């Protein structure tokens, strides 16, 4: 029963992830934490595998659809995302030796919930201040920050990615959604490789993993198609509603974890 529930959550999450730039993990992680069936490291791994699979299928869909992508920019920001992904994964592994599963889940929920609230507020401010960073070092540093946050929190980082891309590079939300998925690919790749090298891959049911990956691939393909067809207003509205709801879930997880 829980496998089917995981599949539905992952499909919806990755569909929205590719559609409006949510990434998927930002939905998967708090909802699987809320269900409470698996430990935090297992949830993080399932989320990373699902989001990584989504990013591959979604990016391939955009390439085939001839979506306009600045590959040089994507490569530069992804270099930072890889470095940040390794650092974030290492910090998570270290904190897991200090805090118990419930406490660390609460800390993650508090940080993610706060970042989501900031994202919703900023992206809905009319004529909000934006920058247009062109320097390669600056682009790498932004990517590093995104990779670190995503990897440490066990999410793709979609809403945070979109906010950073809009703020630092003056992108539209529609364009930011495409580049968000690209950076997610590299940050999650570095996280999974780091786990493999360190031998910290948790014991996960093969059935759960297969269901997660298949649902994520399908969600990524359909979400990328919808992104191509939809306008900025639709994407912004869906993004705002979903992220606001996720902030509430994360604060609930934080409250449950920190007072346990």
PLM features: what roles do these ranges have?
Residues 134-174:
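Transmembrane alpha-helical segments that form core, pore/gating elements
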Residues 28-29, 58-68, 150-151, 161-166, ...:
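Generic transmembrane alpha-helix signature in multi-pass membrane proteins
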Residues 114, 178-193, 207:
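Hydrophobic alpha-helical transmembrane segments of multi-pass integral membrane proteins
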Residues 39-47, 70-76, 170-181:
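Membrane-interface alpha-helices at helix entry/exit sites of multi-pass transporters
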Residues 28-42, 160-175:
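Interfacial segments of multi-pass membrane proteins
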Residues 1-15, 33-41, 60-146, 197-260:
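Juxtamembrane transmembrane-helix boundary motif
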């Amino acid at each position: 029963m829980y496998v089917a529930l995981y599949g539905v959550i992952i499909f919806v999450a990755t569909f929205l992830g590719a559609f409006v730039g949510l990434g998927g993990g930002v939905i998967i992680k708090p909802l699987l934490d809320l269900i409470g069936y698996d430990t935090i490291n297992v949830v993080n791994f399932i989320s990373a595998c699902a989001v990584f699979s989504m990013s591959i299928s979604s990016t391939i869909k955009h390439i085939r659809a001839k979506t306009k992508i600045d590959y040089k920019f994507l490569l530069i920001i992804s270099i930072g995302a890889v470095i940040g992904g390794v650092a974030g994964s290492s910090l998570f592994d270290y904190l897991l030796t200090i805090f118990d599963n419930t406490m660390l889940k609460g800390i993650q929920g508090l940080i993610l919930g706060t970042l989501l609230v900031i994202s919703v507020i900023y992206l809905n401010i009319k004529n909000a201040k934006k920058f247009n960073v062109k320097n390669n070092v600056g682009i790498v540093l932004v990517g590093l920050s995104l990779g670190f946050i995503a990897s440490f929190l066990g999410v793709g980082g979609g809403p945070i990615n979109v906010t950073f891309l809009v703020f630092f590079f003056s992108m539209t939300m529609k364009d930011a959604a495409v580049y968000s998925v690209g950076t997610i690919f590299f940050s999650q790749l570095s996280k999974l490789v780091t786990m493999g090298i360190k031998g910290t891959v948790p014991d996960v049911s093969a059935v759960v993993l297969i269901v997660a990956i298949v649902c994520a691939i399908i969600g990524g393909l359909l979400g990328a198609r919808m992104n191509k067809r939809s306008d900025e207003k639709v994407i912004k509205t869906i993004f705002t509603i979903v992220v606001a709801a996720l902030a509430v879930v994360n604060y609930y997880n934080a409250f449950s974890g920190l007072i346990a």
